[in-house]
């Protein structure tokens, strides 16, 4: 075990990049229309899909050396990158096909796309003319999708030495790709925050909106909340919400000797404290977990809950409004999935109301946390 950990550490050192990949965010003010109807949501969705497809297609022309340089890596897993690209193309085709259903209402960004070859062809020649109503959006969107694609490709390039949300190890891992179109699940990581903090505010706000979310709690933080308040108050905190676990500590569970104890100890605490709120889901911190963990999770009756829309609301990254705009752009691109915020961060309590206001008339749905991943 110690030798394996040392080898993994050496691989990480060899693959260290010179500078972090820029976090993608897009000023939605560059888009000239509000998402005030399902049809207008589809217009914006088609535009983002085509722009991302353009970037994805262009990335395929990079040779091994150029791709390593772009991602800032010395070693890449080309097979994992190729597999991710195939998945992305399939998702883009599915999403564009659905988004075309409103073309009779508004034909903006509607092209004849009936199969993968058609989509690749349209992506290759996609551009926004200088006199277009949407020209102010084009360049910022292109930058956003280049950066977002780099985020995804870099994670695939490091897989499986560094596991993440972009690739699954088995059917016990879920990420919302089976949701219906326009259906999203809200999730929050890293909590609970201290008494009367952001977790309290977010849970109360969701109840007022008649919504729910899945909160992935850290065992140590949850135990501290109980000690500084009471079990009854913690149960009241999460009333109407779902609570999964993120382990006992917020640390990678891929090379931690005590990772199994971290999972079982925290899951038992949540289940004993809040049996009505508990959902048998484990959210790996940073998305990092072991490749051989399927048997363990199945023996515990747990599923691994991943995500596909990351708000990047961690400290030192995006501001609250930038985080919201990033999430909204990815909702337009992926059209369904699992959104992750951190309920220990002030940004979430700013970003969430803005997000709900921006999408209120878009025809979206919010997945009931009790029904997700059943």
What are these regions (language model features)?
Residues 2-185, 197, 204-213, 335-374:
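Terminal accessory/targeting
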Residues 20-50, 291, 296-334:
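Active-site-adjacent pocket scaffolds in enzyme catalytic domains
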Residues 116, 121, 128, 132-136, ...:
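Metal-dependent polysaccharide deacetylase catalytic core of the NodB/CE4 family, i.e.
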Residues 159, 165-167, 173, 202, ...:
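Mixed-charge, polar/low-complexity N-terminal
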Residues 160-177, 195-197, 253-271, 324-327:
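Short, composition-biased local secondary-structure segments
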Residues 267-269, 329-330, 364, 372-374:
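Short, intrinsically disordered/low-complexity patches at protein termini
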